[in-house]
């Protein structure tokens, strides 16, 4: 699967995609029930809105777009029939569904109705198509060019440079808390550590085992860098998720932010912010920990699945609707909202940070069945260190212990 993902991301980054040749003129669905569970941001709004165009007196299409989608998906898809016929997933959120056997192989449906899909979109697990990817994503750096010029500092390419620049901005009284990251306790905080650790080049696990491998000098460096950034952030940084960070940016309260590329179009549009802020916003690759090093981020894909606990008729209807929802027609109408992995996509300014990170060889998020357990442990165990209550080594030891308990419970260790 990693090879498919990297190929797709590379294709988006190099724009090696031809014009569309096979677009559904209509959804081709005569009857059925389609219900979509997804995260809540503009690119996914576009997908769901296109899906809703397939609704008729015999076809129902409903959606639940919420930031709590991860917490809902397993229980919702365990129901029989499943509460949602399609969960829109990412590199990590598909793993619990695969572990529980809650999504169906799509090979037969791809053969019958997937002529418009590119091979690079087909996410395979053990040789079977289990999801259809439609966009690439990563977290990367947003900076305010006007604030940097006012402070007399250059755009940073490493985190040491970013921290030094932020200190100048603070010391000159330009901004008191010039940095924002998605450091909310839980999934977001865990992801920030994973991003930093990826930049060290270290492996999260020992060899081919599920034994954790983060309590080491690379883990300490990642944590210390994260702490230095939070010391230049607002004191309530442990509440910052994507919505909060975007709001801080649009309100002109920060000079640097690490946000998801999928937020780029909303940041650069003419809504929710002032024209001077938008005009001076720059999207670039995530900084590295050292000159010429790997970007401190992970590469992701977003895609759709079809639930296992459905009638074959509703599964077929869902597949056809989701093909329409992620068609070239949808992409062309919303090209600025994501780095689409859809035929015919041409990148724009909002895609620059993701593409730069890909070209700088950012690592894919590890698609391992036990990575979610480590991610959760990191999200719950690192805040004490950031608040000065324990050492980096102790925080990493606690995270490894929490992960080990979870991994043993699930049979990974």
Name these PLM-found stretches.
Residues 129, 150-151, 220, 224, ...:
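Extracytoplasmic/periplasmic substrate-recognition and gating elements
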Residues 130, 139, 163-211:
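Extracytoplasmic/periplasmic solute-binding protein
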Residues 91-138, 154, 163, 192, ...:
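Hinge/lid segment of periplasmic solute-binding proteins
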Residues 104-120, 179-184, 200-221, 270-281, ...:
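Short, solvent-exposed loop/beta-turn-alpha elements that line the ligand-binding surface or hinge
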Residues 28-33, 58, 149, 332, ...:
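Conserved C-terminal helix/tail region of periplasmic/extracytoplasmic solute-binding proteins
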Residues 75, 83-85, 113-148, 177, ...:
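A structural signal for short loop-to-beta-strand junctions that line the ligand-binding cleft
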Residues 6-13, 23-95, 155, 238, ...:
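Conserved N-terminal structural module of periplasmic/extracytoplasmic solute-binding proteins
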Residues 166, 209-238:
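Glycine-centered hinge/linker elements that transmit conformational signals in sensory
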């Amino acid at each position: 699967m990693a090879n498919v993902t990297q190929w797709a991301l590379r294709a988006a980054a190099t724009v090696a995609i031809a014009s569309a040749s096979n677009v559904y003129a209509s959804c081709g669905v005569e009857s059925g029930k389609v219900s979509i569970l997804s995260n809540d941001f503009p690119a996914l709004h576009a997908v769901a809105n296109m899906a809703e165009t397939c609704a008729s007196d015999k076809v129902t299409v409903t959606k639940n777009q919420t930031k709590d989608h991860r917490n809902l998906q397993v229980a919702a898809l365990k129901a029989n029939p499943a509460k949602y016929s399609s969960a829109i997933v990412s590199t990590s959120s598909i793993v619990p569904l695969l572990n529980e056997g809650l999504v169906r192989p799509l090979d037969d449906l791809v053969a019958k109705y997937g002529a418009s899909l590119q091979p690079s979109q087909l996410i395979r697990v053990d040789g079977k198509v289990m999801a259809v990817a439609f966009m690439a994503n990563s977290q990367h750096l947003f900076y305010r060019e006007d604030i940097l010029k006012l402070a007399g500092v250059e755009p940073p390419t490493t985190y040491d440079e970013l921290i030094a620049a932020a200190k100048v901005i603070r010391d000159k009284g330009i901004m008191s808390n010039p940095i924002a990251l998605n450091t909310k306790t839980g999934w977001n905080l865990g992801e920030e550590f994973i991003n930093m650790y990826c930049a060290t080049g270290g492996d999260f696990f020992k060899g081919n085992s599920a034994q954790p491998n983060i309590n080491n000098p690379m883990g300490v460096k990642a944590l210390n860098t994260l702490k230095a950034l939070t010391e230049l952030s607002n004191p309530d940084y442990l509440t910052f998720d994507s919505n909060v960070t975007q709001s801080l940016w649009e309100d002109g309260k920060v000079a640097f932010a690490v946000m998801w590329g999928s937020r780029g179009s909303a940041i650069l549009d003419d809504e929710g912010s002032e024209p001077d802020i938008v005009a001076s916003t720059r999207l670039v690759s995530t900084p590295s920990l050292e000159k010429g090093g790997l970007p401190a981020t992970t590469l992701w894909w977003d895609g759709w699945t079809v639930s296992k606990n459905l009638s074959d008729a509703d599964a077929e209807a869902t597949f056809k609707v989701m093909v329409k929802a992620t068609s070239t027609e949808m992409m062309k109408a919303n090209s600025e909202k994501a780095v689409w992995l859809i035929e015919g996509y041409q990148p724009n300014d909002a895609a620059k940070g993701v593409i730069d990170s890909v070209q700088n060889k950012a690592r894919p998020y590890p698609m391992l069945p036990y990575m979610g357990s480590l991610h959760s442990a990191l999200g719950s165990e690192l805040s004490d260190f950031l608040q000065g209550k324990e050492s980096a080594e102790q925080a990493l030891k606690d995270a490894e212990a929490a992960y080990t308990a979870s991994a043993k419970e699930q049979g990974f260790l």
